[in-house]
Amino acid sequence: MKIDLAHFTLRQMMEMEACTRCGECIETCPTYAEVRNEEIHPLQKIAQTKSFWKADHLGLLARLFGIRPATEGERSTYGRGVYQCTLCARCHVVCPVQIDTRPLWISMREQLVGWGLYPEIFDTLRDRVTNQHNIAGED
């Protein structure tokens, strides 16, 4: 299960490389402030995404640098962090290199859907819309 780079624009990949890991985004993230879980904060999401793409696409070079493919558990943890984000974009506002985070988080979610890692409620909502033509499940 490789990361599909088609979900990310060239600009997004360059922005992730440009992240200075300054931590400004951590202090402003309302979700992280509430739950204090590292998988949620922007630095971690960017670091994990970069790690996945390097392990999946650098081949021998990745092995030389000790980058190993992600386990299913690591991908699942990553997914929880990506989906707990509210997409408020406060991290973008304070980012010194102006990483456009909201579209980046959406691209990460697209990748997770490709892996089949998304909140179960999405299946319920899809089924309700398909069968009852609304998310409330009412006829």
Describe every region a protein language model picked out.
Residues 1-38:
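Long, charged N-terminal interaction/targeting segments
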Residues 6-16, 46, 50-139:
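Iron-sulfur-cluster electron-transfer modules
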Residues 33-49:
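Membrane-interface helix-loop junction between the first two transmembrane segments
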